[in-house]
């Protein structure tokens, strides 16, 4: 009798291991990967810390590959999308611009990625990017519209850009070099912190609205 009571007590008080934190896979390029930064200062780790500090446990999986395009992301997504993935963030497109990909190709690749995730009943959040003006107004207009168009067509969540807060400062005539690495392209740890403070509330809302977290 005592033995049975002890077993029951263990069952009632033991931690439950059948549940784990939701896993969010971030499919991206160098900013997601944490190019030029120690792992602890990279975007994924800082993102995890933001959620932890705000009382929400989420496991972010770093699917960033420096230099990757939407074509590369499309190739990687199917085998990266394991059964334990709760949601996918797609943050690709910058390297398509650098290589001069036609906007319609980028859109097609992103559309296929979204279809793959939705086909597996995995919610998707799309993070956009902006084309520079040196490709011409038509290219920039067509490219920049990809992400908002897809978000509407596929009925998915959308964040305009990782770098939106930095670009906003530039548009005000402010210098943001103190937030960038020596290459002038990739955010340094302070820049990543600015990015995380910008995207995290929007990401939190997405995870709540898709019932991934309460």
Identify the residue ranges that each predicted region occupies.
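N-terminal helical cap/lid subdomain that shapes the substrate entry/recognition surface
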Residues: 67-71
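N-terminal signal peptide c-region/cleavage motif recognized by signal peptidases
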Residues: 13-15
């Amino acid at each position: 009798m005592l033995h049975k009571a002890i077993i029951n007590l263990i069952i009632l008080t033991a931690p439950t291991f059948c549940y784990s934190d939701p896993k969010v896979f971030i499919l991206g390029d160098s900013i997601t990967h944490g190019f030029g930064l120690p792992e602890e200062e990279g975007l994924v780790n800082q993102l995890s810390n933001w959620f932890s500090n705000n009382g929400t446990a989420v496991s972010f999986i770093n699917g960033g590959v420096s230099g990757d395009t939407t074509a590369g992301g499309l190739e990687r997504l199917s085998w990266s999308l394991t059964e334990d993935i709760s949601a996918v963030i797609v943050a690709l497109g910058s390297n398509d611009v650098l290589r001069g990909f036609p906007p319609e190709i980028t859109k097609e690749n992103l559309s296929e990625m979204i279809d793959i995730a939705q086909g597996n009943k995995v919610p998707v959040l799309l993070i956009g990017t902006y084309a520079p003006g040196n490709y011409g107004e038509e290219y920039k207009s067509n490219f920049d519209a990809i992400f908002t168009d897809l978000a509407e067509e596929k009925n998915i969540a959308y964040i305009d850009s990782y770098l939106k807060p930095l670009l906003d400062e530039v548009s005000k005539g402010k210098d943001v070099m103190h937030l960038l690495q020596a290459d002038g392209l990739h955010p340094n740890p302070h820049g990543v912190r600015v990015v995380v403070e910008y995207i995290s509330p929007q990401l939190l809302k997405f995870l709540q609205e898709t019932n991934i977290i309460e």
